[in-house]
Amino acid sequence: MQQDMQNGGPGNTISNLSSALRQVNLGNSNTTTDQSNISIDFNQQQLLEEANQGSINAYNAQQQQQEHLQQQAQQQQLHMQQLQQAQQQQAQQQAHQQQQQVHQVQHQHVQQDHMPIGQSQQQAMYQGPNPIDSSRITKFFQNQPMEGYTLFSHRSAPNGFKVAIVLSELNMHYNTIFLDFNLGEHRAPEFVAINPNARVPALIDHNMENLSIWESGAIILHVVNKHYKETGNPLLWSDSLADQAQINAWLFFQTSGHAPMIGQALHFRYFHSQKVKSAVDRYTDEVRRVYGVVEMALAERREALIMDLDSENAAAYSAGTTPLSQSRFFDYPVWLVGDKITVADLSFVPWNNVVDRIGINIKVEFPEVYKWTKHMMRRPAVIKALRGE
């Protein structure tokens, strides 16, 4: 109403009529003109009321039309919201159905004793309820070798290659059977009988009445202790109980912390049915923490070695006036336990070889780990084992 008064609505009509009345009313004297003014005033008042009523009616009609349009707009908006909700519910139902279909496939989870490496090999790691073709495994167990070792592994299993590296370093006679997960060979009854976890690696020691061992750490300890007992040479091992304890500590650290964390980081980065960034970040950060532990240990070994072998510059190194990186022994190999390579070191190799696939550059982030790994990767036995020979 206030807007109408400003734009020439009913209020403006009243103002114009009042001006006209003032012009007709000549004064306060009682003349005949005053009587005519009364008539004019009465007529003008009637016109004023009629004009005002017409404006009010027009205004009310306009208001009703606006309210009707607003109601139509609100109804249309409500209809659109209901349509969008229906579409969202339909999309959610479709996504839920797809997720159920995914979960109906029984994937074979990659655990600490089995982690795929190549993208083409990743699909082979997940097995649905396919029939088991155990013919090859059955044939092997019906005619086992009389001596040596049989290693059950997979082409994409770092822990299987970890055992192969130790067997190769000890120059032990062994044969590797790479299981075909697409055929379900890891679920063959004969294999489950020697490894109830139905995972790789598993080892049969044919020289000990076909003794079967499973879990990579247990296999390595069996092999290295047997070699030491038979030869008297603590190769990859130690004749010191104190050093043996330290070797065991690092070996258990690798099997319980290093390998599983990389395995989970790979799983959530590449294999999980949904992208869960928090899981990827959590396991990748944990891998970095683990490498930080190894990096610190190797750095301490490096400093001790330089101080021992580069004695003429030891004072400058201790004072900090000369950085350790200037020592000629800065790239000299150092090991986790003692002054020689052991199974504690070699157990890390296959997993260090795949860690770049979770976005960790050990050369940049962990230089001592990188140098340590590089020395081990150049060993002939390691090269042979990683080739699957």
Swiss-Prot record:
InterPro entries: Glutathione-S-Trfase_C-like, Glutathione-S-Trfase_C_sf, Glutathione_S-Trfase, Glutathione_S-Trfase_N, GST_C, Thioredoxin-like_sf, Ure2. Residues 240-389 form the GST C-terminal domain. GO terms for molecular function: transcription corepressor activity. One of its GO terms (biological process) is nitrate assimilation. It holds the Pfam family GST_C. Residues 147-231 form the GST N-terminal domain. Keywords: Nitrate assimilation. Signal peptide: none annotated. PROSITE patterns: GST_CTER, GST_NTER. PANTHER family: GLUTATHIONE S-TRANSFERASE-RELATED, TRANSCRIPTIONAL REGULATOR URE2. Plays an important role in the cellular response to the nitrogen source. URE2 gene plays a major part in the repression of GLN1 and GDH2 genes by glutamine, and is required for the inactivation of glutamine synthetase. URE2 gene product may catalytically inactivate GLN3 in response to an increase in the intracellular concentration of glutamine. Belongs to the GST superfamily. Homodimer. This is Protein URE2.
